[in-house]
């Protein structure tokens, strides 16, 4: 699969060279193409969410959390490097970097309001979009991420309590480098009209033998955790945007975005086999389109079901998350 990724990356670069004649070239200019859908689990959109959870890791140091709301904060940015535009051939190509951070916070816990999990990721992305003359298919796109890094850490209160009080507690460091490839039909780009978009993608690890996580004997009380084996994930995403029709307008866009991803459910015990899990991430709501600033503000309902998506807790299934999300991007 790595050879396929490398071949695809080289092919995309060769296409850019061939299309380079009569093209416009820009440095550090936003291309707007192949941005993450709102429901993408590793989205770079800025979000503040207040939500209800049905469960957490069994080692969490308090057990009354189900009766209060939690906060999840997403901070992210995409930094453009290069943008090619060929108006005659209706073709766009861009290279950018991105970085984001996700915090899960027990904000209304009375003692310390602890950060439960910190997740950050960054990578390099190449994207290409070709517009076609079809009333239903506006464009076709390809996204290649030759490398991205993700790392997650549980909060100090969580880990200190677990290490001091729980005999079987282990702190697992989820940290890995991966690659990703995705194809899209009807990338939203700068389109503001009604549009149904679809994306499929796949990612794998560069170091398959290391897996998604490592352990330190000082943090696991000399217990071992087997390395992960099924080190890949894939997803399908659908994104519907409407500015014409019921309960929407040119300035108030209705968005329904959903991702179904198949991810590895971790196992830190030799006796328990790791397994795979289908997970759903759904956003439904509206965003206000600002023509002057180029940024949009939206209010959405979010629902997630599957394994806990946060780092070390990906060994826990049956997770439900429902709440309101204030989005700025």
Residue ranges and their predicted role:
Residues 22-130:
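Transmembrane beta-barrel domains of Gram-negative outer membranes and organellar outer membranes
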Residues 4-14:
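Sec-dependent N-terminal signal peptides
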Residues 91-242, 303:
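Outer-membrane pore/translocation modules
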């Amino acid at each position: 699969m790595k050879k396929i990724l490398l071949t695809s990356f080289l092919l995309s670069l060769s296409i850019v060279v061939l299309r380079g004649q009569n093209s416009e070239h820009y440095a550090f200019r936003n291309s707007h193409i192949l941005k993450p859908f709102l429901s993408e689990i590793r989205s770079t959109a800025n979000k503040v969410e207040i939500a209800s959870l049905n469960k957490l890791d069994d080692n969490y140091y308090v057990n009354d959390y189900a009766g209060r709301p939690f906060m999840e904060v997403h901070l992210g940015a995409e930094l453009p490097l290069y943008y090619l535009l060929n108006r005659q051939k209706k073709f766009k190509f861009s290279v950018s970097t991105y970085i984001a951070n996700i915090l899960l916070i027990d904000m209304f816990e009375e003692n310390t309001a602890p950060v439960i999990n910190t997740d950050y990721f960054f990578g390099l992305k190449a994207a290409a979009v070709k517009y076609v003359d079809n009333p239903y298919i506006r464009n076709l796109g390809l996204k290649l991420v030759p490398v991205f890094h993700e790392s997650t850490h549980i909060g100090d209160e969580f880990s200190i309590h677990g290490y001091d009080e729980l005999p079987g507690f282990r702190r697992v460091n989820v940290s890995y480098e991966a690659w990703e490839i995705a194809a899209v039909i009807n990338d939203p780009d700068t389109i503001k009209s009604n549009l149904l978009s679809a994306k499929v993608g796949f990612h794998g690890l560069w170091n398959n033998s290391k897996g998604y996580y490592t352990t330190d004997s000082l943090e696991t009380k000399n217990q071992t955790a087997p390395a992960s084996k099924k080190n890949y994930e894939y997803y399908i995403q659908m994104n519907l945007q409407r500015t014409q029709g019921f309960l929407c307008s040119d300035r108030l866009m209705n968005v329904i975005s959903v991702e179904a991803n198949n991810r590895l459910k971790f196992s830190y015990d030799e006796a328990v086999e790791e397994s795979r899990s289908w997970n759903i991430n759904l956003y439904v709501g509206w965003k206000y389109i600002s023509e002057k600033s180029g940024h949009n503000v939206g209010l959405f309902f979010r629902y997630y079901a599957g394994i806990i998506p946060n780092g070390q807790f990906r060994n826990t299934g049956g997770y439900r998350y429902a709440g309101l999300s204030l989005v700025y991007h």
